């Protein structure tokens, strides 16, 4: 395996409903994904190559605000060769956040914890990320060499911009491109905000979750391309990373259809640019293990130091 043949999925989920309920799946609109999803399910599903690359490794991301779920994902990462890093959850508002993070890092699979995430998209406070208790928690995250996965909706991007301004040393990655309003709504406000966010060099962006922001049944590559072009122009290939958002992506076509779309959108890209988006940027941000036999290709992203974990 060489790095030029490697594909990293920097954003997917796993859940075992027999072990841990996922109450958000009670929404009738999510009935199609209301079942257990395992690493083997992902292996058997994710067969489409992108620019000739096959899936080599992944970053699994928390779903619920629940430390035991994160513990489960870390223990799984320790046993599962496909999973190279975990984006976990801990209560950023808790005075005990430092102790909780230390326990996670010292526990089973703790070395796989590379970033934290909170579903800010569900918070009604327009300044949630600037709350003093949240900022204290983010300082604890930064102090342990971890990154932060920013999950906000388009109208909440101002919070993400303020976060970037106030935490210039905290490595941040915007999830799902800030959820642009692709399905028949004017994306001008999203574009303006995302370009401002991209002015901060410590902020990267996941090209993920776009198809579920489009019309699930009728979207085409043409619907995705305007958002793709904004992201490439704002962040550049070296600060973008591919993610599937599987199995949520199954609501709008699934892993392979999204992969085929990305393959089409990469037409005309250089080898270096494709490697950055498909593997290099995620490898640097999440401190993933380098690929065996890949010493001939630089997998570093100069603007993103590897977290100290």
Residue ranges of model-derived segments:
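Mid-to-C-terminal alpha-helical segments outside catalytic/metal-binding sites
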Residues: 2-8, 26, 30, 36-51, ...
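Histidine-centered catalytic micro-motifs
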Residues: 7-17, 174-177
């Amino acid at each position: 395996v060489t790095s030029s043949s490697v594909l990293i999925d920097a954003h997917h989920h796993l859940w075992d409903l027999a072990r841990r309920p996922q109450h958000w799946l009670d929404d009738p609109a999510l009935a199609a994904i209301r079942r257990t999803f395992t690493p083997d399910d992902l292996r058997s599903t994710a067969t489409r190559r992108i620019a000739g690359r096959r899936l080599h490794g992944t970053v699994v991301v928390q779903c619920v605000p629940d430390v035991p779920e994160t513990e489960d994902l870390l223990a799984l990462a320790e046993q599962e060769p496909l999973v190279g890093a975990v984006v976990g959850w801990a209560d950023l508002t808790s005075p005990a956040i430092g102790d909780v993070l230390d326990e996670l890092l010292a526990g089973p699979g703790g070395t796989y914890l590379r970033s934290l995430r909170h579903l800010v998209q569900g918070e009604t406070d327009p300044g949630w990320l600037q709350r003093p208790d949240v900022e204290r928690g983010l300082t604890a995250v930064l102090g342990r060499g971890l990154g932060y996965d920013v999950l906000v909706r388009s109208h909440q991007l101002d919070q993400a911009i303020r976060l970037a301004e106030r935490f210039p040393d905290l490595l941040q990655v915007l999830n799902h491109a800030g959820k642009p309003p692709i399905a028949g709504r004017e994306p001008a406000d999203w574009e303006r905000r995302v370009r401002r966010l991209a002015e901060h060099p410590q902020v990267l962006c996941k090209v993920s979750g776009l198809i579920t922001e489009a019309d699930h049944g009728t979207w085409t590559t043409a619907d995705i391309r305007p958002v793709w072009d904004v992201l490439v122009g704002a962040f550049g290939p070296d600060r973008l990373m591919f993610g599937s958002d599987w199995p949520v992506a199954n609501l709008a076509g699934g892993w392979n259809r999204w992969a085929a779309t990305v393959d089409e959108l990469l037409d005309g890209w250089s080898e270096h640019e494709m490697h950055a988006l498909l593997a290099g940027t995620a490898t640097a941000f999440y401190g993933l293990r380098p690929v065996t036999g890949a010493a001939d290709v630089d997998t570093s992203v100069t603007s993103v130091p590897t977290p100290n974990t």
